[in-house]
Amino acid sequence: MFSRLSAVSLRQGFVVQRRLFSYARPLLNSGSQATANQNTARETNNEYQYSGTRIVPKLSTFYSANPHHEAHIDNLEALMRKYIKYPTVQVEERPMWLSLQEYALIGGGSRLKSTQYKQLLFLLNRLNSIDPQLMVPEISNTLAKYHKKTKLQPQRDTLKELDEFGRSLAIGRRKTATAKVYVVRGEGQILVNDRALNDYFVKMKDRESIMYPLKAIDSVGKYNIFAMVSGGGTTAQADAIMHAIGKALVTFNPLLKTRLHRSGVLTRDYRHVERKKPGKRKARKMPTWVKR
């Protein structure tokens, strides 16, 4: 009986001891396990932080259709809002801004549209119209970035002069006709290819076209005209001579340029007969459609 009780107590003691050792095992490695848990938590926290971060775009207009152009517009509009109360003056000569092709190199390339370029010019001209006495370096330095970078000065139109005989030479064109005209002060004599005007041009309309520049400035009978014309028909030749006479009269008096330009004699007429297309009767006329 005693031996049986002792065996049971020993067995229970081993069980209790085994349970104590099983509970005590983690306590033996508590330091290393805590360090591992801390490292795991730190890595998890870092991964969470990195997963929530993103790259900040360099431009605030990154998500627009044309970020670079919009950045330029934002800067100019900020200056406009800052100096909107500054008085403006009427500018006689505007600086040479960057052309559309030149601005495209810094304004978005192929994304740049002509309307966006016009918007830029409007802001530049508005800032440039501020009174020069109140112009601040912030505005002038910003506008200088959009000036045309070239050392060449704009060429001025050189006025043509009369030759040694007091004649003015000009060349006019219309369709395939070319006219070389000499104009000199005289009694109103007009020769075309060494022939009189009435003899060379039979149609009254052609003769009136040649005299039209002189009528526009009230100078009929004050100039002698010698024309050499070739190519085209009679109407085209008459228009070519009219074009050349208008250009030659400007040499005598540059102040007549505005009046002649309004009369339309200084602008070349580029209209040509439209070519015939295959399958059509003429340039646009279609053959009559027949159902059957």
UniProtKB/Swiss-Prot annotation:
Gene3D superfamilies for this protein: 3.30.230.10
UniProt GO molecular function: RNA binding; structural constituent of ribosome
Keywords of this entry: Mitochondrion, Ribonucleoprotein, Ribosomal protein, Transit peptide
Subcellular location: Mitochondrion
Chief place where the protein resides: mitochondrion
Region (Disordered): 273-292
Domain of life assignment: Eukaryota
GO BP of this protein: translation
A cellular-component GO term for this protein: mitochondrial small ribosomal subunit
The keyword Transit peptide belongs to this UniProt entry's keyword annotation: yes
InterPro entries: Ribosomal_Su5_D2-typ_SF, Ribosomal_uS9, Ribosomal_uS9_bac/plastid, Ribosomal_uS9_CS, Ribsml_uS5_D2-typ_fold_subgr
Family: Belongs to the universal ribosomal protein uS9 family.
Family annotation (PANTHER family): RIBOSOMAL PROTEIN S9 (PTHR21569), SMALL RIBOSOMAL SUBUNIT PROTEIN US9M (PTHR21569:SF1)
Name of this chain's protein: Small ribosomal subunit protein uS9m
Organism in which the protein naturally occurs: Kluyveromyces marxianus (Yeast)
Protein's gene: MRPS9
